[in-house]
Amino acid sequence: MEITLEDLLKSRDERHAHQMQLLKEHEGLTLVCLTVVMPGSVKRNVQSLVAAHAGVDALRERFAGETVSLEERDLDTGYEAYLLTRLSPLEAKERACEIEETHMLGRLFDIDVMDASGCPLSRSAVGRGARRCLICDGEARYCMRNHSHSLDELQARINSMIDAYVQRI
């Protein structure tokens, strides 16, 4: 199913509201939120689900014994996972960055960490550099902003990454 810009913006607002609600219901905890990087108008497909399930498995493994709750949502606008932990926001962000940087599909994961007041932590808060582009390894935000790579290039790279991952499991 193709997603419009309006759908995407609405889903972001709903995700933010859900994050705030979780933090309100679970006072004092740190929230870890996983989504999948999936360029284009189709956000939910076989590739995004493979990546999402791999990301959730990585969260379960990396936050084992530290997870208060884990909620998963399979939406047309993409898969979302919400993990609540008693870890400090800095420790949670460190673990999230480790997943993004070491997992075979980690560059397809967008793992945000929010403190108890809802403030997101940046990668630089734990001494990490900016996210890298899937194609050229430059800073992803610049390539995205400048449309440095075509949608076909990005989708081909994502498909290649997922195919390699599936062959290994």
Language-model-derived ranges and their functions:
Residues 68-69, 75-86:
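Aromatic-anchored, charged helix-turn/loop surface patch used as a conserved interaction hotspot
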Residues 1-66, 74-76, 94-169:
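Long, contiguous binding/interaction regions
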Residues 36-38, 83-89:
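Short beta-strand-to-loop capping motifs
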